[in-house]
């Protein structure tokens, strides 16, 4: 069995190139296909190619980096075993690599980790320890155990050999198509982007390498703006595979030097990209797996790119099946094919008919209403559009010219997650209430902790929860606080769940507030 050679602390590009060429990743990983997306290529007037890392034995690229590092361990290190912390694809990569190398592995995963992920790691032969409420607590425990018991820590991204292992993907890309114009790569901790960029710039520097981040987890963008890695105050939950608060030090150094550009996208755009992948190549990508395609589509539109050969990395397909319901609901918005509007119309006979006639025959995709006032009615309406933002603006102008008050909710996350399912729940009298959105761990006892901390001191006047198949759920709750708001803030801090005050959200005022 080949052994990779150790790299220096901050290797230069040529040293990374040699490490990529020597990385013995194919003892565990596979060369994955580069496949043309015929339908999308025709639609976007470019040749769109997808690198199918979902075809790896662990259904993600993470196997490359994990094996590259672990294959280079000394016999003494292998005898002591390895440890890592992960709730996702890195855990499976380490477990699979350990089985191939005959090395004991311990994977520390947060207690809220979905059973499907825990079972997958165990299925590859890894020992699992469930510890902590989140990744940071799991990581702290893993590092503690590494120091106490002599395990070797296998980082998910910020290590030269992990980066070199991910760089083998770029070498395959160039061998499969040497005429690429641009390559789009997803970014979480930066290992894949760093490995791809440094390899391509050593061999074919004319190819542009563009990083893609989720808007709510853009740690690389924040680091580039600051000039050094920084901690994000919070990260999004939807594209959990790239939900990293801080870019790695070495990955940042390489990304800063070798990347050509960076772009961010929202969750709706990711959902639309997931649909594109399914319709074109029948791949069911996880959200972070479709991130690069979402960024590519946005980049093409922003820069009016035509006639180029563009590749993107489908980085993983470890999707929770129940999360696909959420994707299906949101992809129309991501494709700019649906407008969500709050419209005030007269509470009188014939007003619905007049409103629909003013839409000019456009298809209504959603219509939510409940009587609440004798004078005016507030309706939540979805309208199918075919020309994106321009048509949405045209509809709003038509409605305003027709005498209606209109608020565009198409980009309002709270409206899309919660309010659309709650229209008609306005209280009969004004309430002194504050509205908050929460992120709950999907684990036994989470709701009980919430109620023990907050529900016994203040009346809960509104509550909405819907599972989206991720490790965390989204909850919308309102409380009658009266004169006890300072005490409530203290209790929120004790609760420890991520939360945001939504009391001034227009969707709340239109449809739910007393």
Curated annotation (Swiss-Prot):
The protein depicted here goes by the name: L-Threonine dehydratase biosynthetic IlvA
* Record-level GO BP terms: isoleucine biosynthetic process; threonine metabolic process
Keywords, A to Z, come to: Allosteric enzyme, Amino-acid biosynthesis, Branched-chain amino acid biosynthesis, Isoleucine biosynthesis, Lyase, Pyridoxal phosphate, Repeat
User: Known CDD domains for this protein?
Assistant: ACT_ThrD-I_1, ACT_ThrD-I_2, Thr-dehyd
MF GO annotations? pyridoxal phosphate binding; threonine deaminase activity
By what means is the activity of this protein regulated? Answer: Isoleucine allosterically inhibits whereas valine allosterically activates this enzyme.
Indicate where the modification N6-(pyridoxal phosphate)lysine is found in the sequence: 62
Q: Which domain of life is it from?
A: Bacteria
Per UniProt, residues of the ACT-like domain are 339-411, 434-504
Which E.C. number(s) belong to this protein?
4.3.1.19
The residues listed in the UniProt record as binding pyridoxal 5'-phosphate, with positions renumbered to this chain, are 89, 188-192, 315
Q: Kindly state which reaction or reactions the protein catalyses.
A: L-threonine = 2-oxobutanoate + NH4(+)
Which pathway does the UniProt entry assign to this protein? Amino-acid biosynthesis; L-isoleucine biosynthesis; 2-oxobutanoate from L-threonine: step 1/1
